[in-house]
């Protein structure tokens, strides 16, 4: 009987405390992620209705239903919040693009379809397309150029077209980002016109003849 009591007591001893602390840490981290996402969701709604460059931290805090102090606890400034938003949407966009072009194996066709799908998905999103409005400063292009996440995912896409030297892959990925942002700011006459330009001027650089063969 005494042994049973001892075992029962040990069940809520140091090991159990560590388990509870780990669980609490996980819950705390999860709550932080949820709160951060809610703030970005509120910012997204504002980006949909207003020029992203005019949206400040005061407006975002009000839309998110939190104080400025709380907002700054998650994002130290507007640039950090913008970067977090762009990175989140880039991951989502990349996953959607991969799914839509998953059945295309030819590198040339895959590249054209990937660019066309990217342009279409961004343009269909009021929040994302607002970053590339010609009536506003090119904030979207600037963020795309500065984002390590966008650069890395673009390089990963280029790498999926065929193995190559890592430095070459990175350079082609950066070039691809510039091409896409340029088309978002200065679109072609229509989808066919843009695809024709991609096939003539982008494919030969990103997917050389020897690589396609």
Predicted regions and their residues:
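Short hydrophobic/aromatic patch on the recognition helix
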Residues: 64-75
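Alpha-helical structural segments
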Residues: 34-45, 49, 63, 80-103, ...
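Short, well-structured alpha-helical segments
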Residues: 112, 116, 169-178
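Amphipathic alpha-helical packing segments from all-alpha helical-bundle domains
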Residues: 91-94, 137-174
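Amphipathic alpha-helical segments used for helix-helix packing
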Residues: 113, 117-148
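Basic, helix-initiating cap at the start of DNA-binding domains
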Residues: 2-50, 54-63, 80-83
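Amphipathic C-terminal alpha-helical segment
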Residues: 120-124, 159-160, 174-193, 204-212
């Amino acid at each position: 009987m005494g042994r049973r009591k001892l075992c029962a007591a040990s069940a809520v001893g140091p090991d159990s405390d560590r388990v509870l602390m780990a669980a609490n840490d996980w819950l705390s981290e999860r709550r932080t992620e949820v709160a951060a996402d809610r703030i970005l969701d509120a910012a997204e709604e504002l980006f949909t209705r207003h020029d992203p460059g005019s949206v400040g931290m005061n407006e975002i805090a009000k839309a998110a239903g939190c104080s400025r102090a709380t907002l700054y606890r998650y994002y130290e400034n507007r640039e950090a919040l913008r970067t977090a938003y762009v990175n989140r949407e880039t991951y989502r966009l990349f996953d959607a693009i991969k799914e839509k072009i998953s059945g295309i194996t030819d590198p040339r066709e895959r590249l054209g379809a990937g660019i066309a799908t990217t342009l279409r998905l961004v343009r269909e999103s009021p929040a994302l397309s607002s970053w590339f409005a010609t009536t506003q400063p090119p904030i979207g292009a600037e963020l795309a150029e500065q984002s390590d996440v966008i650069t890395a995912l673009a390089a990963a896409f280029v790498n999926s077209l065929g193995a190559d030297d890592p430095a070459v892959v990175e350079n082609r990925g950066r070039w691809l980002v510039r091409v896409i942002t340029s088309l978002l700011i200065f679109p072609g006459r229509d989808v066919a016109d843009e695809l024709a330009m991609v096939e003539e001027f982008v494919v030969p650089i990103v997917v050389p003849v020897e690589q396609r063969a």
